[in-house]
């Protein structure tokens, strides 16, 4: 009995010892290293007692750690699984997806250099044919479970780069999408430590642990969020390091180039004005020269009106950028204009620009459109002398109806267009009166605006009409630069309404001449005549004669023989309208540009932006300011008269002249000449 119990105890001990030796092998040190690299180290390792059965637990944990620490890379299966090649006639088995891919490319696709290139896929039932080896090797990735291209946002792997590119578009949120950095470049605040691990797309904006690289774009350093006492920052801090596609450098350089181009063109234009290189009295010459200044970035007036075609640069103020208390944006200064350096140059150029304005406003077409030289205006005052041009007289006779004028203030509106955009100025239809409504080419100093006439004698000539819209905002010079000078009567502003007809003549339609070829039908209806169908000519004459209407009584717009005539007339009218609109727009641009140039010159004169040294130099060399060789308060050069020296002999003079190799240096206080000899 005791022997049987001893045998049972021995078997039980052997059974208990066998699992520890076979089932739970001693773990190798490699899984422990992987475990320490992947999982955070515990605070204090617990001591392992020798009495507890540790080997089985340790083996289970090591196996789980090895499975987690070594996942299938690039989507390939575990090494224990074998992948079979399904190419036609091949039964090769590979241990990994990379090996299978290399096997297919080298064994079945081949190369042109080895004379075994195959461009037809024979994987299973696939018979895709390509034209290049690169194409078929890219196609083979569809059959092989190889996914080397991983998304850095969500960690999903793809077989081909084009599949990854399509997948990235699903993350296309403008606020969080960050493109992958180019090779060799470092994008601050957008770097993932350890490659894409499947973090959220917007997590890297606010977690300091994911921003190991300090910010390089702004001056406030790396963001420190969720802290009790943040470090001091300059004014207007940002709400996170967010990159905006502002492109300050490129836009600033382009803006500087465009402004410099306009600055140089304006300087050249002023030089041409000073040299009178084009006729100021020719509308065509003035328009051609002004064409070169349009659509350019001209200097911005300080506190004055801006041309409508010049966009105003908008300042950019975002968090972390330029703040009012910090460094401002880069400022550049253009060199002064060489052709407008003195005050005299500015005054002369202002006179030339005034003459150009007179030429623009006195253009025959636009003066006729304004009602100055219309055919119906037969009234000519006896006091007016005959003028060869259509321009208005510079002085009005005292008996003519005039308007009381008053000085107007400068307009501070940023645009220099007409205050009455759609409503023309309502003035009596007089050639002289229409040019006293603020449109005459007057100087900047003698600006006037229209007020209702206040006189007793001439008020009965014309009815009292309402004043122009926004008359108080009309500025000096040429404030209303609408399209062509609008008609001065109550008519519209379209070309069809500008037609003037001479009245006082009664007219009627021209009587139509009787057609002698049409004979009266005197035939009698009867069987003796014969029943026959009348010819087309006879039927047409019979049907047209009783209902025919005189062509002179039909509206010309309705009287057309065919539709082609109406279409051609419509096309002609449309073309004429387009030409008129284009001409009017060009005229408006010329007027606006001249107004801007005159405001620019006036602003420089008001601020004193001219060279004062030239004025002092002119005063220094003027003869009336000299008195006894110098003037008090003006610097004079040291041109002291030197006492005459005794004449040297010709031999000494010739020797001294031959030996001097440098110009003579004269002392300021001495009378002797210092000569430098070789």
UniProtKB/Swiss-Prot annotation:
Keyword Zinc-finger: yes
Record field: compositional bias (Polar residues): 417-448
Biased composition range(s): Basic and acidic residues: 509-535, 621-645
Domain of life: Eukaryota
Annotated SMART domains: ZnF_C2H2
Locus of motif YPX[LI] motif 2: 662-665
Location of this chain's protein in the cell: Cytoplasm; Nucleus
A molecular function GO annotation: DNA binding
Positions of region (Disordered): 1-51, 381-547, 621-678
Motif segment (YPX[LI] motif 1): 462-465
Low complexity bias locations: 7-25, 397-416
GO cellular component: cytoplasm; nucleus
Annotated signal peptide: none
Residue spans, zinc finger C2H2-type: 83-108, 119-143, 149-171
PTM summary: Activated by C-terminal proteolytic cleavage by signaling protease (probably palB/RIM13) at neutral to alkaline ambient pH.
Main localization (coarse): cytoplasm
Recorded coiled-coil stretches: none
UniProt xrefs under Pfam families: zf-C2H2 (PF00096)
Alphabetical list of PANTHER family matching this protein: PH-RESPONSE TRANSCRIPTION FACTOR PACC/RIM101, PH-RESPONSE TRANSCRIPTION FACTOR PACC_RIM101
Its biological purpose: Transcription factor that mediates regulation of both acid- and alkaline-expressed genes in response to ambient pH. At alkaline ambient pH, activates transcription of alkaline-expressed genes (including pacC itself) and represses transcription of acid-expressed genes.
Family: Belongs to the pacC/RIM101 family.
Name recorded for this polypeptide: pH-response transcription factor pacC/RIM101
Species this protein is from: Aspergillus giganteus
Gene giving rise to this polypeptide: pacC
């Amino acid at each position: 009995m005791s022997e049987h119990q001893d045998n049972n105890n021995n078997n039980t001990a052997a059974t208990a010892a066998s699992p520890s030796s076979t089932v739970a092998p001693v773990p190798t040190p490699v899984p422990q290293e992987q475990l320490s690299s992947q999982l955070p180290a515990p605070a204090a390792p617990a001591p392992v007692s020798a009495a507890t059965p540790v080997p089985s637990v340790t083996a289970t944990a090591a196996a789980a750690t090895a499975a987690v620490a070594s996942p299938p890379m690039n989507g390939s299966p575990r090494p224990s699984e074998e992948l079979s090649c399904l190419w036609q006639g091949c039964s090769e088995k590979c241990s990994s997806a990379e090996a299978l891919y290399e096997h297919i490319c080298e064994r079945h696709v081949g190369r042109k250099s080895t004379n075994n290139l195959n461009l037809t896929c024979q994987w299973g039932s696939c018979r895709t044919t390509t034209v290049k080896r690169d194409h078929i090797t890219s196609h083979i990735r569809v059959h092989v479970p190889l996914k080397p291209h991983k998304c850095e946002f969500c960690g999903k792997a793809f077989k081909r780069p084009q599949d990854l590119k399509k997948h990235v578009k699903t993350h296309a949120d403008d606020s969080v999408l960050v493109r992958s950095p180019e090779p060799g470049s470092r994008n601050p605040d957008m770097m993932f430590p350890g490659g894409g691990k499947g973090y959220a797309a917007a997590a890297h904006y606010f977690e300091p642990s994911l921003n190991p690289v300090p910010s390089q774009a702004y001056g406030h350093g790396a963001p420190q969020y969720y802290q009790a006492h943040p470090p001091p920052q300059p004014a207007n801090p940002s709400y996170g390091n967010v990159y905006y596609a502002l492109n300050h450098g490129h836009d600033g350089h382009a803006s500087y180039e465009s402004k410099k181009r306009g600055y140089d063109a304006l300087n050249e234009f002023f030089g041409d004005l000073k040299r009178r290189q084009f006729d100021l009295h020719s509308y065509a010459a003035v328009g051609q020269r002004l064409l070169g200044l349009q659509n350019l970035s001209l200097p911005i007036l300080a506190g004055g009106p801006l041309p409508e075609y010049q966009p105003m640069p908008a300042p950019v103020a975002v968090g972390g950028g330029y703040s009012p208390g910090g460094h401002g944006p880069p400022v550049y200064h253009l060199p002064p204009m060489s052709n407008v350096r003195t005050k005299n140059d500015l005054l002369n150029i202002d006179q030339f620009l005034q003459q150009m304005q007179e030429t623009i406003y006195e253009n025959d077409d636009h003066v006729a459109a304004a009602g100055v030289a219309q055919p119906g205006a037969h009234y000519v005052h006896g006091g007016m002398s005959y003028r060869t041009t259509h321009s208005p007289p510079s002085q009005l006779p005292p008996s003519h109806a005039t308007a009381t004028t008053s000085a107007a203030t400068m307009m501070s509106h940023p645009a220099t267009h007409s205050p009455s955009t759609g409503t023309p100025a309502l003035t009596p239809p007089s050639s002289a009166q229409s040019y006293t409504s603020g449109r005459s080419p007057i100087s900047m100093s003698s600006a006037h605006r229209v007020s209702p006439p206040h006189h007793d004698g001439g008020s009965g000539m014309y009815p009292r009409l309402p004043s122009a819209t926004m008359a108080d905002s009309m500025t000096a010079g040429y404030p209303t630069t609408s399209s062509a000078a609008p008609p001065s009567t109550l008519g519209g502003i379209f070309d069809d309404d500008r037609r003037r007809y001479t009245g006082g003549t009664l007219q009627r339609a021209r009587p139509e001449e009787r057609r002698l070829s049409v004979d009266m039908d005197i035939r009698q209806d009867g069987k003796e005549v014969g029943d026959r169908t009348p010819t087309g000519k006879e039927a047409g004459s019979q049907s047209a004669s009783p209902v025919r209407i005189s062509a002179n009584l039909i509206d010309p717009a309705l009287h057309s023989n065919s539709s082609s005539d109406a279409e051609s007339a419509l096309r002609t009218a449309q073309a004429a309208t387009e030409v008129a609109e284009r001409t009017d727009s060009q005229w408006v641009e010329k007027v606006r540009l001249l107004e801007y140039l005159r405001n620019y010159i006036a602003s420089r004169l008001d601020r004193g932006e001219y060279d004062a040294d030239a004025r002092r130099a002119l005063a220094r060399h003027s003869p009336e300011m000299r008195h006894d060789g110098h003037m008090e308060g003006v610097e004079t050069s040291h041109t002291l008269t030197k006492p005459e020296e005794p004449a040297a002999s010709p031999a000494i003079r010739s020797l001294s002249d031959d030996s001097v190799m440098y110009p003579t240096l004269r002392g300021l206080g001495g009378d002797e000449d210092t000569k430098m000899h070789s």
